[in-house]
């Protein structure tokens, strides 16, 4: 199987996001890498589902709360930027202050 660097990155994000989701389901708080992976994966999947950049930027602030992440993580993650593939091409999605 031959994967491009971007495809390898997406698989890594998927694996980390899956781990993060399992930990959330068990009631554990997410650390920094898990938080970024979880948010990034939501953007990638939203783009795949046909959502617009503006929809993802708006929804992105509702995916995680401060209660779901370790202390200090919400201050560390002031924005998340993800290049996602949309039907009309690749676009950069930026979510400002994603953890409320």
Curated annotation (Swiss-Prot):
Phosphoprotein found in the keyword field: no
Gene Ontology MF: a single term: nickel cation binding
Location in the cell: Cytoplasm
Keyword Hydrolase: yes
Any GO BP: urea catabolic process
Domain of life: Bacteria
EC number: 3.5.1.5
Notes on activation and inhibition: Inhibited by HgCl2 and acetohydroxyamic acid slightly by EDTA, but not by boric acid or L-methionine-DL-sulfoximine.
Catalytic activity: urea + 2 H2O + H(+) = hydrogencarbonate + 2 NH4(+)
Pfam families found in the cross-reference section: Urease_gamma
Activity's thermal dependence: Optimum temperature is 55 degrees Celsius.
Pathway: Nitrogen metabolism; urea degradation; CO(2) and NH(3) from urea (urease route): step 1/1
EC class of the enzyme, as a word: hydrolase
Keywords: Cytoplasm, Hydrolase
PANTHER family: UREASE
The protein's assembly and partners: Heterotrimer of UreA (gamma), UreB (beta) and UreC (alpha) subunits. Two heterotrimers associate to form the active enzyme. In most bacteria it is thought that three heterotrimers form the active enzyme.
Family classification: Belongs to the urease gamma subunit family.
Protein name: Urease subunit gamma
């Amino acid at each position: 199987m031959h994967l491009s660097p971007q495809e390898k990155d997406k698989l890594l994000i998927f694996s980390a996001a899956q781990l993060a989701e399992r930990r959330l389901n068990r009631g554990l708080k997410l650390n920094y890498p898990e938080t970024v992976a979880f948010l990034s994966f939501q953007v990638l999947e939203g783009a795949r589902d046909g959502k617009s950049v503006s929809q993802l930027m708006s929804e992105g602030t509702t995916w995680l709360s401060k209660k779901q992440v370790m202390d200090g993580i919400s201050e560390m993650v002031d924005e998340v930027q993800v290049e996602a593939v949309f039907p009309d091409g690749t676009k950069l999605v930026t979510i400002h202050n994603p953890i409320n």
